[in-house]
Amino acid sequence: MALASELMDRRTLLAGLASGCVVALAGCQTNPSTGRQQLLLVSEGDLAQLSATTWRQTLEQERRVTDAAVVRRVSGVGQKLADRSGLARMPWEFAVFDSDQINAFVLPGGKVGVYRGILNLFENDDQLATVIGHEIGHVRGRHAAERVSQQIAAQVGLTVAQVALQQNEVRYAREIAGALGAGVTFGVILPFSRTQEYEADRLGVDIMAAGGYDPRQAVAFWDRMTQANAQRRQPLEFMSTHPSDGNRIAALNQYVVQRGYRA
């Protein structure tokens, strides 16, 4: 009896995972910028429309830097990179937010936000181009669409598994479904996110070079970021969506050397 129940549990879980796999296989496409196959169930255009509202709300709610020279600097570097990114037709916008956060972000559709806190780390425009190039790299890499698609595919499989578990009255159905969810998060979704971060670094370095900036300054910037983070508690890489600074610097340096970039 126990063996039969265990086999039923396994079949139920496998059925849910199989459903997610069918969705995943149906949506796989090759990204021409990277040569990597991606799960793309939604388009960048659809996400751009959804993100437009978020961008407008952010501009209305967040305080922005009013120093015209700072705004011109960020917008100038950003537009120069965007023009050489292969995505020049996209309606790019660049905003500088008045916050101590050491961060920057990009929304689908070419909306880039840079925080005042991170500007203090830049020694030159090449390092500013490192960050903006990285954000543009996420767009060129179709990472937002891929991330959403991964979540859709994972949720399809999880939903089927949860329903089947409940209908078959499997013992500890809620606990098993919860564990399955954690497994998908740490085993599938987060590693892809780290892959996207490394990919955005590489694409960003290429965009920097195309825009006339020194790609070697990407390594210098992350060295400075490491020093800034020295007093902060960092999560273990396995539990994080971002590569650790040390691994990031090593990967960037290897790529810059491999590409033979010079100032």
Which residues are covered by each model-predicted region?
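A Zn2+-metalloprotease active-site environment signal
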Residues: 2-263
